[in-house]
Structure formats: C-alpha cells, structure tokens
C-alpha cells in the first residue's frame, strides 16, 4: 500500500494545488471521493486490471462518472489512465484529504468516553488540544462503555489515556512487576 501512497502523492498534490487556486477544494474532494468509489468497485477493478487501451479506459471511466466530474476532473482521470494509475484513486483521495487538513491547519482528534460528553466538556477538550497541537482541531466523539469513566484522546500517533480502564491497567502492570 505504501507504493500506492508514493504513486498517488504527485496526483493528489497537483489536484489539491489546482483546487486551492480555483477555490474549489470541496468540489474536488467530492469528485475524488466519487472517482475513488467507482475505481474500487469490483467490476471496475477487473476492468482496470484488464488490457484496455488507456484512451478507452479513461472514456469508459469518465462515462461511468457522468456529471460527477468536471472538465478538470476528467483531465486528471485521462492523465492517470495514460500512466496506468487509476487503481491508486483511493490513495489519491487519502493524500488529498491529508493535504487539505494540513492546509486548513486542522487535526482530527478522536475522543472516546463511556458516556456522551457535555458541550462544556467538549469545549475544554478542544481548547486544550488546540493549545497542545498548535492548530485547530476537529473532535470525533465515540462512546465505548469499556472505558468505564474518563476519556481517551487520540490525535495522530499521540494518545492521552485518562480513562479508569487505563488507570486500572497501569496499576495492574505496577503490581505485577
């Protein structure tokens, strides 16, 4: 999969730069999401791995996408088809989303708790994480009864475990050593 990421990066960067320049980042993300879903369809996967000429492949792909792709989106599909890169569309979308998050200076923060958190608690968590990460954050809240009480916060590879379950696990580790 890392090969797909490496191959997808220049396509995602080009699409993102174009989208920013033309103030159409939302539209481009929608187009890429649709194209990635088409490319990951089982029948389309078979077609992409077949021996179709790049022109025929891009025409078929664009016809299937219909009005979902504008002219610039169709051009991206044509270039990717010419280079045999259509199977990497999902990775292109993932890279595009990462570029957008970096551009928007936002970080995805997962907050796991045993119960629904109040708006005041979410505001405090958001403010603390914005200060710690030096960027705006988008909270994705999840409920997990096994947490017992407290919260687990994940942002990228950082994990803050303030749950009772985590404390009990750490206590058990100390007692066993």
UniProtKB/Swiss-Prot annotation:
Membrane topology per record: Peripheral membrane protein
Subcellular location: Cell inner membrane
Pfam families in UniProt: OSCP (PF00213)
CC annotations in GO: plasma membrane; proton-transporting ATP synthase complex
Keywords carried by this UniProt record: ATP synthesis, Cell inner membrane, Cell membrane, CF(1), Hydrogen ion transport, Ion transport, Membrane, Transport
Signal sequence segment: none
A single GO molecular function term of this UniProt record: proton-transporting ATP synthase activity, rotational mechanism
InterPro entries referenced in this protein's UniProt entry, alphabetically: ATP_synth_OSCP/delta_N_sf, ATPase_OSCP/d_CS, ATPase_OSCP/dsu
Domain of life: Bacteria
PROSITE patterns registered for this protein in UniProt: ATPASE_DELTA
Main location: membrane
PANTHER family membership: ATP SYNTHASE DELTA CHAIN (PTHR11910)
Family note: Belongs to the ATPase delta chain family.
Chain's role: F(1)F(0) ATP synthase produces ATP from ADP in the presence of a proton or sodium gradient. F-type ATPases consist of two structural domains, F(1) containing the extramembraneous catalytic core and F(0) containing the membrane proton channel, linked together by a central stalk and a peripheral stalk. During catalysis, ATP synthesis in the catalytic domain of F(1) is coupled via a rotary mechanism of the central stalk subunits to proton translocation.
Subunit structure: F-type ATPases have 2 components, F(1) - the catalytic core - and F(0) - the membrane proton channel. F(1) has five subunits: alpha(3), beta(3), gamma(1), delta(1), epsilon(1). F(0) has three main subunits: a(1), b(2) and c(10-14). The alpha and beta chains form an alternating ring which encloses part of the gamma chain. F(1) is attached to F(0) by a central stalk formed by the gamma and epsilon chains, while a peripheral stalk is formed by the delta and b chains.
Annotated protein name in UniProt: ATP synthase subunit delta
Phylogenetic lineage: Bacteria, Pseudomonadati, Pseudomonadota, Gammaproteobacteria, Enterobacterales
């Amino acid at each position: 999969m890392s090969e797909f990421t490496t191959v997808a990066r220049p396509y995602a960067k080009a699409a993102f730069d174009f989208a920013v320049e033309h103030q159409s980042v939302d539209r481009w993300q929608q187009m890429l999401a649709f194209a990635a879903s088409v490319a990951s369809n089982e029948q389309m996967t078979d077609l992409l791995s077949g021996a179709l000429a790049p022109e025929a492949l891009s025409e078929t792909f664009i016809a299937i996408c219909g009005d979902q792709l504008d002219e610039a989106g169709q051009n991206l599909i044509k270039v990717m088809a010419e280079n045999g890169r259509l199977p990497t569309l999902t990775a292109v979308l993932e890279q595009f989303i990462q570029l957008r998050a970096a551009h928007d200076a936002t970080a995805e923060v997962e907050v796991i708790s045993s119960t629904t958190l109040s708006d005041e608690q979410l505001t405090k968590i958001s403010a603390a994480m914005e200060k710690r990460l030096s960027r705006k954050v988008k909270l994705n809240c999840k409920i997990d009864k096994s947490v017992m009480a407290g919260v687990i916060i994940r942002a990228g590879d950082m994990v803050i475990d303030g749950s009772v379950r985590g404390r009990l696990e750490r206590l058990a580790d100390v007692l066993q050593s």
